[in-house]
Amino acid sequence: MIKIAQRVSDMSESATLAMAAKSRQLKAEGKDIISLSLGEPDFKTPEFIKEAAKEGIDQNYSTYMPVPGYEDMRIAIANKFQRDNGLKYQPNQIVVSTGAKQSLINLILSLVNPGDEVIVPAPYWVTYVEQVRMAGGIPIELPTSIENDFKISPAQLKAALGPKSKLMLFSNPCNPTGTSYTKSELSALADVVADTEDFYVISDEIYEHISFAHKAESFAQFDNVFDKTITVNGVSKAFAMTGWRIGYIGAPVEIANACIKIQGQYTSGAASISQRAAKAAVEADPEEIRFMVDAFKKRRDLVVGLLKEIEGLKINNPEGAFYVFPDISSFFGKTNGDFKVNNATDLSLYLLSEALVAIVTGEAFGDPNCIRISYAASEAELIEAISRIKRALEKLK
């Protein structure tokens, strides 16, 4: 028997990818599955981006790339940070990676020593705590609730800080809740960070353009924490480019250089043609993708309205990303025949078998009372899926 490394045994499988794989398997078996499990836009990559990729092929961008990204790509990203976020990063503070997920692991491996504590507001994206553990760090989860729109308070952050605290890692707008912090809310958190020595923030802003109630705010905009903040972003969500695999960071030079060193031993530079396509994306006026954002907002309103009609569900109004995160704890302890729902994982499996709808348990995101539903699907699919969910939940007694 092959002995796999303990770090792999200690690692949880990505719940979102696992549910997506299960959905594909059932579809292949002929089941009429509606999958609302993955965080992937259902739009096509815009034509102007695909044209940039074709030009890259014709111009023979086919050799090894600089590890941190092409120079003109880093310049384009620095310009994007200035234009969209008011952040003054220089090109040597930019590192381009094979997706924002790689950007995150580069940063965590660069900053976290074994035993360091990393504060992670919960709910959180499933990968955060696993990457922290891979580096030998200790995730410190800060619980939130649907009643306060899943936001942490400055007092809560301050109380969590200790001698081993090294990082706070969070997304804004948030996956899985759709929560979007206001400028004043971030400013209050920034004041706590600024007063804490040798403590940094990784601000995952991959959903920045998919924001409904107000402009998504960057944590690094505040002067007192600019040098303590690493901004993570990418092109996957806003530009429907999940398969192109381009993410990037803006960071203090020392941290950027550490990420370059790590990336040079892992993957080297991100794919050349993907960089040419992503350059066109980051240089584009955000209005180029307004139609997608408007569609997501319309779907958000549709899904929230339909879910509010289901007795027993508790739901807030997400302000960004493309997820809803309803509290389903009122169904715990109920049964349908031989199937008993004890927790959110049970409920997600019940909905898959009874309603043929794939969603993701909130336990994977650090909240055992909720489920994540992605509305990155057509309106017709969403209406049918919520109808199935409603019928299935009504059968629980």
Model features per residue range: what roles?
Residues I2-I4, V8, S12-S14, M19, ...:
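PLP-dependent class I/II
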Residues S37-E40, E55-M73:
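A glycine-/small-polar-enriched, mobile loop at the entrance of the PLP active site in fold-type I
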